[in-house]
UniProtKB/Swiss-Prot annotation:
The keyword Transferase applies. Belongs to the aspartate/ornithine carbamoyltransferase superfamily. ATCase family. It comes from Vibrio cholerae serotype O1 (strain ATCC 39315 / El Tor Inaba N16961). GO terms for biological process: 'de novo' pyrimidine nucleobase biosynthetic process; 'de novo' UMP biosynthetic process; glutamine metabolic process. It catalyses: carbamoyl phosphate + L-aspartate = N-carbamoyl-L-aspartate + phosphate + H(+). GO terms for cellular component: cytoplasm. Its EC number is 2.1.3.2. Signal peptide: none annotated. It holds the Pfam family OTCace. L-aspartate binds at K85, R168, R230. Keywords: Pyrimidine biosynthesis, Transferase. GO terms for molecular function: amino acid binding; aspartate carbamoyltransferase activity. This is Aspartate carbamoyltransferase catalytic subunit.
Length: 309
């Protein structure tokens, strides 16, 4: 029996079922424990990044090679002949998809991954980020990291801190965790960077409990997961940014009353929002989280390219 992810476009977390998310998390754990360099042997995967990326691109390309695949592609689409000659994205996708078995793509334009899926001639498209819209593989590694540290994906207390308005990682993770039972969310952000209304409306419809806070200190003792994000300086004037930034900097002292199982996650890169003394605490998990990106992406690629896995 074919798994439901076989040959499926991975465009948005919202389009993945709870069962599919659980399958990816389970497979990631299996591949971390027991590597399999034959899973996509003789498969060729395009890694096409139309805007610069470090972690996501290297993580995907590592994952492809560790499970036996080959990689073609580029890491700065603006410098390719495709862009310089004025070729449309649709035509570029048509051409590249004729060479490969799967198509991993990052693009600055929202909706670009969806467009690519319409012109890929049936080749599965994996969205590696389209503007501020979606970044599903980041959410998959977040889910795997949560499961690895907590042993479950339900009945969790999770705080999202920082830029909740523009941060695509927090939108997708909230949507994913809403598919599981009895999760409780704490949204900690300045009013100008609050979680978007559409996410809150989705949570209301799903019956997910959430609370809104302006500071994080009072919620830390209640948490299993503390998901930090960067407050973006460019969205504020200097005086406002200085005030907001200081309210959302996590130090080791903040964790003195934390639950023993609390883990701090961050999509990286961090700037000032987590001080380096947190790195030495048992709560820090953001570098392990980055490593888990390889296993989550191995699992995703293996399931998309193997009918019976």
């Amino acid at each position: 029996m074919a798994n439901s992810l076989y040959q499926k476009h991975i465009i948005s977390i919202a389009e993945l079922s709870r069962a599919e998310l659980e399958l990816i998390v389970k497979t990631a754990g299996q591949l971390k424990a027991q590597p399999n360099p034959e899973l996509i042997k003789h498969k060729v995967v395009a890694s096409c990044f139309f805007e610069p990326s470090t972690r996501t691109r290297l993580s995907f390309e590592t994952a492809i090679q560790r499970i036996g695949g080959s990689v073609i592609g580029f890491d700065n689409g603006g410098n390719t002949s495709l862009a310089k000659k004025g070729e449309t994205l649709a035509d570029s996708v048509r051409v590249i998809s004729s060479y490969v078995d799967a198509f991993v793509m990052r693009h600055p334009q929202e909706g670009a991954a969806r467009l690519a899926s319409e012109f890929s001639n049936g080749v599965p498209v994996i969205n590696a980020g389209d503007g501020s819209n979606q970044h599903p593989s980041q959410t998959l590694l977040d889910l795997y990291s949560i499961f690895e540290t907590q042993g479950r994906l339900d009945n969790l207390d999770v705080a999202f801190v920082g830029d909740l308005k523009y941060g695509r990682t927090v939108h997708s993770l909230a949507q994913a965790l809403a598919k599981f039972d009895n999760n409780r969310f704490y949204f900690v952000a300045p009013e100008a960077l609050a979680m978007p209304d559409y996410i809150c409306e989705e949570l209301d419809e799903a019956g997910v409990k959430y609370q809104v806070f302006s500071d994080m200190e009072s919620v830390i003792p209640e948490l299993d997961i503390l998901y930090m994000t960067r407050v973006q300086k460019e969205r504020f004037d200097e005086s406002e940014y200085a005030h907001i930034k200081s309210a959302y900097i996590l130090t080791a002292a903040h964790l003195s009353d934390a639950r023993s199982n609390l883990k701090v996650l961050h999509p990286l890169p961090r700037v000032d929002e987590i001080t380096t003394d947190v790195d030495k605490t048992p709560h820090a998990y953001y570098f392990e989280q980055v490593e888990n990106g390889v296993y989550a992406r191995e699992a995703l690629l293996a399931l998309v390219l193997n009918e019976s896995l």
